[in-house]
Every structure is written in structure tokens, then in C-alpha cells.
Amino acid sequence: MKRFLIIIIGGIAYGMALLFCGNIFELSDSQMKLLYICSAIAIFIITLTINLVYNFIYARKINKLIPLLEEEKYDDYIDKMTAIRNKVKSKYIRDTVQLNLTPALMGKKEYIAAVKILEELESDVRKVPLSDMVRRLNLCFCHFYLKNYDKAEALYINSKELFDRYKNIEIYHKNFVLLDLFMDICCRGKKEGLAERIKEARTKFTDKNLVGDFDYLDSLLEEKD
């Protein structure tokens, strides 16, 4: 409602400014039309530039917090992310912050809280393929840890086309290797060669935050023996 009122007031002020200029400079109808077009284009460009700069500044602030996540300082990470979320006006940035909160919640094993956020974001991030991929990927992992295997499998199948766009990109490849291991153990009923695949992945991907995932996969495999 507040934004709607601002738009109305801004539109009225813009119209009055154009009329004022037209009266002061005694502009003809064609000159007024040209003034309207040029000023509208200028306002659009200025607004777009301000929005891009605003989003860029906060995107950098978010990226600077990633080391806290890698160091498993989850509470500190969540506090700082939440402070950004509560401060920003941009809905896009707020959604990005919400999405970036979920890995920390997952690191703290608060999977139900992470699922709630990820499901609430569905309609908001659907039009941004990368954000939607990350949302779906994290949601798959949450379902696996909550042992909601039917939901995890259904989401995986529904997301396969989107996942295939990103699975071979270096920064995401390890996550999809992990996801396929979960699928093979929990949904596809595979056992043969999985211990070796987990060991190979553990050797290849040495990120500290993946150790717990590999340990959990080993424990799932042991349960099947």
C-alpha cells in the first residue's frame, strides 16, 4: 500500500512538473510530447541504474559472509544475514538472503526450518533459474535428511531438466555428485560400488562442510548391509 501511494504521488508530481515546464517555456503540443518521452526514458534509466547499484552493493555484502558458512560459524552467519534481510527494501535481495539462510540451517540440522523457508520461496524465485535450482537442490537434501524419500525423489524427477543445466558447472558439480549418491542409496536401491564412489567423492571434494554428508552416506550404506 505504501509503495502504491508513493507511485501515485510521484506520478502526480511528475505530471505537474511537466505542465509547469510547458507553461513557463510556452511549449507546443509536439514539444510537450517530446519532453514527456525524453523525461520518461531518463527516469527509467536512472531508476534502473539505482536499482542495479543497490542490488550489487547488497549482493557483495552477502558474498562477504560466505566464509562464515564455510567455517561452519552458522549462528554468526545467520545473525548477519538476518540483519541484512531486515534492512533491505528490495524484495529480490530479501529473497536472496532467505535462500542463503538455508545452508546454515541445514548445517545446524534444522531441516524443518529450512524446508519451511524453501517452500515459501517457491513462487518468488521460480522466474530466476539459478535461484530456483539452488532452492530445489537444498530442498532435496533436506528431504533426504528428514527421510522423506518419496518427496525427495519426486522433486528430483521434477527438477531434472533444471538440474541438468548446472550439474557440470564446477561450483555446483560436487553438490550434484552428492545428490546422485543420495538418490542411488535412498531411492534407487543401489549398493554395488557405492562405497567406492563415496570414497572417491570424499577424496575429490575436500570441503569441510561436506564431511558430515559423506559420513551420513556411509552410515546409510551400512544400514543396508
Labelled PLM ranges:
Residues 1-66:
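N-terminal alpha-helical membrane-insertion module
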Residues 31, 47-112, 117-121:
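N-terminal topogenic membrane-targeting module
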Residues 130-172:
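Non-cytosolic head/periplasmic domains of membrane-anchored proteins
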Residues 77-84, 111-123, 148-163, 189-204:
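Alpha-helical repeat scaffolds
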Residues 71, 108, 146, 184-189:
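Structural motif corresponding to the intra-repeat A-B loop/turn of tetratricopeptide repeats
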Residues 55, 91-94, 129-132, 169-174:
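Residue signature of alpha-solenoid helical repeat architecture, marking inter-repeat boundaries
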Residues 166-225:
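Extracytoplasmic/periplasmic C-terminal soluble domains
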Residues 59, 63, 99-100, 134-145, ...:
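"A position-specific structural signal for the A-helix of alpha-solenoid helical repeats
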